[in-house]
Amino acid sequence: MSTVAAYAAMSATEPLTKTTITRRDPGPHDVAIDIKFAGICHSDIHTVKAEWGQPNYPVVPGHEIAGVVTAVGSEVTKYRQGDRVGVGCFVDSCRECNSCTRGIEQYCKPGANFTYNSIGKDGQPTQGGYSEAIVVDENYVLRIPDVLPLDVAAPLLCAGITLYSPLRHWNAGANTRVAIIGLGGLGHMGVKLGAAMGADVTVLSQSLKKMEDGLRLGAKSYYATADPDTFRKLRGGFDLILNTVSANLDLGQYLNLLDVDGTLVELGIPEHPMAVPAFALALMRRSLAGSNIGGIAETQEMLNFCAEHGVTPEIELIEPDYINDAYERVLASDVRYRFVIDISAL
């Protein structure tokens, strides 16, 4: 066992504080990682504030982890000391169900072991990337291509794969009309990835205040949803819509933006259920779907794609003592577009 510094939430109402946690010694199949950077995800905030259920306090958040291998177990074959690696949203799964055997471990039937706020197979709570080091089974570690700087690679492990997976699953590419609802941490990755895949990307946002950013990031067009005329102009105009926001929406308005056989994919998690108008689905054979991060192989594919196409998130690098301020700014939508913690300053 080793002791490392970390930032943890002790309750739903207290700010995160600096503390120490223990990490297991690497087993035969484990990789020990010196964490260099950790992204801040809105999921971190939902979890520590107990908005998605009661956490196992203390909680060390962070599932966008980039670092360097410091040691490997005796039977590790994929990595060696000095390799640049990442860890995403989960660190283990059952490896036996039909989700795991198909490479979509995020949908593990018994439940994946998440990077934090889960109970690992050793019976101990998992703790995330707001810490100096982590030990992970090699099968749940990602290789970060050399051309990707570690700080911008970190948010790809959640924000990147959350958008890449549905874009790939619903075959976004040339001659595909894709709309991204929301231009935040997730949405800006949807624009960049969709454009890199060759899709015709449109941003749908409440106002036009980020229009310049949206077009610079690769969108072909940008519309304000606060303007009722937007929904008339764009009716039937998209093959795929990815909803990255967590606010409750009038689903009927957005479903009517889809062409025949179009799909609206929910990526955000609204606080309250939303009504689904059956006519908007049935009359044009539209679909309403959801998507959640991606499997290990697909996440590696995404990293390689980003390296090949020069796709990286736009980040604001912060020191650990700024985490609580960063949380407040995320809640105020005051970041363009992802916070990344410099763990070397921990």
Curated annotation (Swiss-Prot):
There is a cross-link at K209 (Isoglutamyl lysine isopeptide (Lys-Gln) (interchain with Q-Cter in protein Pup)). One of its GO terms (cellular component) is peptidoglycan-based cell wall. It is an enzyme of class 1 (oxidoreductase). Zn(2+) 1 binds at C41, H63, C158. The keyword Ubl conjugation applies. GO terms for molecular function: alcohol dehydrogenase (NADP+) activity; oxidoreductase activity, acting on the CH-OH group of donors, NAD or NADP as acceptor; zinc ion binding. Its EC number is 1.1.1.2. InterPro entries: ADH-like_C (IPR013149), ADH-like_N (IPR013154), ADH_Zn_CS (IPR002328), CAD-like (IPR047109), GroES-like_sf (IPR011032), NAD(P)-bd_dom_sf (IPR036291), PKS_ER (IPR020843). Binds 2 Zn(2+) ions per subunit. Gene3D superfamilies: Medium-chain alcohol dehydrogenases, catalytic domain (3.90.180.10), NAD(P)-binding Rossmann-like Domain (3.40.50.720). SUPFAM superfamilies: GroES-like, NAD(P)-binding Rossmann-fold domains. Zn(2+) 2 binds at C94, C97, C100, C108. Pfam families: ADH_N, ADH_zinc_N. Its cofactor is Zn(2+). It catalyses: a primary alcohol + NADP(+) = an aldehyde + NADPH + H(+). Keywords: Acetylation, Isopeptide bond, Metal-binding, NADP, Oxidoreductase, Ubl conjugation, Zinc. The modification N-acetylserine is found at S2. PANTHER family: ALDEHYDE REDUCTASE (PTHR42683). Belongs to the zinc-containing alcohol dehydrogenase family. This is NADP-dependent alcohol dehydrogenase C.
